[in-house]
A protein has these predicted regions:
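Solvent-exposed interhelical
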Residues: 129-155, 165, 181-197
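Membrane-interface helix-loop-helix regions
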Residues: 16-24, 39, 65-127, 218-226
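Alpha-helical transmembrane segments of multi-pass integral membrane proteins
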Residues: 202-303
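Functionally critical transmembrane alpha-helices in membrane proteins and complexes, commonly lining
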Residues: 1-49, 65-73, 248, 292
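Aromatic-anchored segments of alpha-helical transmembrane domains
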Residues: 1-4, 103-107, 153-165, 198-210, ...
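Juxtamembrane transmembrane-helix termini
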Residues: 30-61, 71-88, 258, 262-263, ...
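Structural signal for the C-terminal ends of transmembrane alpha-helices
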Residues: 44-52, 80-82, 137-143, 181-190, ...
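Interfacial loop-to-helix transition and helix-capping segments at the boundaries
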Residues: 21-33, 111-127, 160-179, 192, ...
Length: 312
């Protein structure tokens, strides 16, 4: 998604490898984000026990999200600060608080600030952090009153999204997140019935709102992918999937930075289809290597800190 956006000059140049628009006019980036939020809801519902309290949940989420984010930010900030002097000249020092909270890119996207010290993480890190805040409440609601939870969620989120009160960055994704949580409780027959209904709903919603269309289509496609998943239940796909899952967050943190740096060395207007394909391969390899390097650096720092401060 970001590769395609970058090499087309954010859609000012012709596409070379991939289209940016899917059926029903759905933007590829929005579709990927929808699947991301659905998977996030499902994975949390699968791994977080019902008896875990909110405080413990927030503590574990913070430990999983912030250390690697701060490390990636420091590395990228250091590079940009030295290699591109003046990159952060317009940022107010107080906006470092947004970086500390993981909300710097979100704040720019939402229009809270014009510029800050954002380097990594992008807007949907902030969005998923807001969803993490809601997770204990949604989990309890689904367990006690699932229909009421869904009714209240839709009654609040759809108007907020349509009115743009959240800059259309959070509210539309709460039902996606909740759908991922709910998916685990659905019987097989229910899933088979729900998939075409959601896709039909996406068709009907197209003239109304693009992101709601994308949310419905994403949920329908997610069910179809889940139904097809047993076909990949083989040793090597499981191994590959497990390895990719280990580095997925690190990939998320570094991939956008890398494609921007790589693309800066090319005249995108004359970049051929072949060279675009080669750049894509280089980009994938660089992202894989950078993600592993970031995780290695985190492990090394943790080991060193544990040796210096064993009581922590």
């Amino acid at each position: 998604m970001h590769f395609n956006a970058t090499v087309t000059g954010y859609f000012t140049l012709p596409h070379k490898l991939f289209t940016s628009t899917l059926l029903l006019g759905i933007y590829l980036g929005d579709f990927g984000s929808s699947l991301f939020f659905i998977v996030s809801g499902a994975s949390l519902a699968l791994t977080v026990p019902a008896e875990q309290g909110p405080a413990q949940f927030y503590k574990r989420r913070a430990r999983a999200v912030y250390p690697l984010f701060w490390l990636a930010w420091f590395v990228v900030f250091s590079y940009r600060f030295v290699a591109h002097p003046g990159s952060f000249g317009g940022a107010r020092t107080v906006t470092l608080v947004l970086t500390l909270l993981g909300l710097d890119n979100f704040a720019v996207a939402a229009g809270w600030v014009g510029t800050d010290f954002a380097c990594v993480g992008e807007w949907f890190l902030g969005s998923i952090l807001f969803l993490y805040l809601l997770f204990p409440l949604l989990q309890r609601g689904l367990r006690k009153r699932p229909w009421l939870t869904w009714a209240l969620t839709l009654a609040v989120c759809i108007p907020v999204h349509l009115l743009g009160w959240d800059a259309r960055l959070v509210a539309v994704h709460i039902p996606e997140f909740l759908f991922g949580m709910t998916f685990l409780t659905l019987a097989g027959r229910t899933r088979c019935i729900l998939a075409p209904l959601l896709l039909a709903g996406a068709v009907l919603a197209q003239p109304w709102d693009g992101k709601i269309t994308c949310a419905l289509a994403g949920a329908g496609v997610f069910i179809l992918l889940a139904l097809a998943a047993p076909l990949l239940d083989r040793p090597w796909p499981r191994v590959v999937g497990a390895q990719l899952a280990k580095i997925s967050y690190a990939v998320f943190l570094v991939h956008h930075v890398l494609i921007q740096e790589l693309a800066a060395h090319f005249d995108l207007a004359v970049l051929s289809r072949r060279d675009t394909a080669l750049l894509f391969v280089v980009y994938l390899a660089a992202t894989f290597a950078a993600a592993h390097a970031l995780l290695w650096l985190q492990r090394t720092l943790r080991t060193g800190l544990a040796a210096l401060c064993p009581q922590i």
